[in-house]
């Protein structure tokens, strides 16, 4: 299944979650798009709930189904809770950490920064958004990309960087000090439903 490239706001309303991180999609119309308005939502079956939760998380991180499932399977080989490990691996993606640093307003924009070669890891350019960052590694904006308008604008509006990143705004770099803990990850996701979905 290909990565979704359509209108993010429409998808956010359909899934009932803000994919932009701003919440603006759901402020005026907190219901799925369509001609029937707020009364069209149907009660989902158990399978429907599991599928919806899986889709919410997959689209939140902007991944294809193949990438998503591969990461899920990798998490199952780790010690500990499968669902939590899965969330931790998703959070360690390079494009996501660029977003968490505040270098981009959305994960989609962060993925473009990585794709276009503006980001380095430990001084080496990495243009693979799914690159898994390890604790202790440092993520930076390439020196020739420091003056990108999109980066400057994102930095101006960002007021939160998670504790597992130590961010230097002057250098536009951050060290991934440790893996995220479950309490630091999206609370609106029930990863147990996703484990159930793939266990069917």
Swiss-Prot record:
Q: Which cysteines are cross-linked by disulfides?
A: none
Q: What does the subunit comment say?
A: Part of the 30S ribosomal subunit. Contacts protein S5. The interaction surface between S4 and S5 is involved in control of translational fidelity.
Source superkingdom? Bacteria
| InterPro entries per the UniProt record, alphabetical | Ribosomal_uS4, Ribosomal_uS4_bac-type, Ribosomal_uS4_CS, Ribosomal_uS4_N, S4_RNA-bd, S4_RNA-bd_sf
- Pfam families per record: Ribosomal_S4 (PF00163), S4 (PF01479)
Name a GO molecular-function annotation.
Answer: rRNA binding
Task: Name the protein family.
Answer: Belongs to the universal ribosomal protein uS4 family.
**What is this protein identified as?**
Small ribosomal subunit protein uS4
Q: What does this protein do?
A: One of the primary rRNA binding proteins, it binds directly to 16S rRNA where it nucleates assembly of the body of the 30S subunit. With S5 and S12 plays an important role in translational accuracy.
Question: Could you tell me which HAMAP family the record lists for this protein?
Answer: Ribosomal_uS4_B
Q: Which organism is it from?
A: Bacillus cereus (strain Q1)
